Regions:
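Hydrophobic alpha-helical transmembrane segments of multi-pass integral membrane proteins
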Residues: 1-238
Length: 238
């Protein structure tokens, strides 16, 4: 399948940037700034637009460009259009449906990536994509944002964790270290699921997972080695 020329990602990137600006605008409104409201529910859409709109578009676009498959440009398109429709027509479900389809496409992209390379970092990012899809499905079926935001958080946390694992592969973590990481991720995801039924316990358990992930990274992230590198550029990139 032919790849898109380099100029084609630009419209998707514009949608992502506009999504970021809309999310920031909504965030400032939630902080109490007296800004003109584009729609009556803009402030309430801060989280969905920031995560599913801006970051959803950007992350899926990055993978589409890297994989060079035409069909992979559909998720960032759906995500970019989804946040826009959600803002313009806040009382209609079309925006949520588009964002949910975008996250389904994100899972499809990660499925292909895992098929090509079955590794700890790809599985971690795949779980993040599944969490994104789960959160959007719950939102579409009427769950409150304060409940589904845990799944959106997992999307970002596991995506970043997976990318850090990919960068740190040269350190070759032992099998025991990988098992420990998997156990920590299990704790984190269990807390997120539990939060749907018991918010306090779920918050505490997922919070424990959030603490353990960076603690695990203290020993296994290449950044801690490169930050002491003799070359300034390497330290800066870290």
């Amino acid at each position: 399948m032919k790849a898109f020329p380099n100029r084609h990602p630009l419209p998707f990137l514009i949608l992502a940037i506009l999504g970021l600006l809309a999310a920031l605008w909504a965030g400032l409104m939630r902080l109490g700034w007296q800004l003109p409201a584009l729609t009556t529910s803009l402030a309430m859409l801060h989280g969905p637009v920031m995560i599913s709109g801006f970051l959803g578009t950007l992350i899926t676009l990055e993978r589409a460009v890297a994989m060079k498959q035409k069909w992979m440009y559909l998720p960032p398109l759906l995500s970019g259009l989804g946040w826009l429709v959600a803002i313009i027509f806040p009382n209609l479900p079309f925006g949520v449906i588009l964002l949910t389809l975008a996250s389904l496409g994100g899972v499809a992209i990660l499925t292909e990536i895992v098929r090509r390379e079955f590794a700890l970092h790809t599985i971690t990012m795949f779980l993040g994509a599944v969490a994104w899809l789960t959160g959007n499905l719950l939102w579409m079926f009427g769950w409150q944002i304060y409940q589904v935001v845990f799944f959106w958080m997992a999307f970002l946390v596991l995506t970043i964790a997976g990318e850090r694992l990919e960068l740190s592969r040269v350190l070759r973590p032992t099998q025991m270290q990988q098992i420990l990481f998997g156990f920590i991720v299990t704790i984190f995801l269990a807390g997120i699921i539990l939060a749907l039924f018991n918010l306090q316990l779920g918050t505490r358990l997922s919070g424990l997972g959030l603490l353990l992930i960076p603690l695990w990274s203290l020993r296994n992230d290449i950044a801690w080695r490169n930050i002491r590198h003799k070359l300034p550029l390497t330290r800066y990139i870290t």
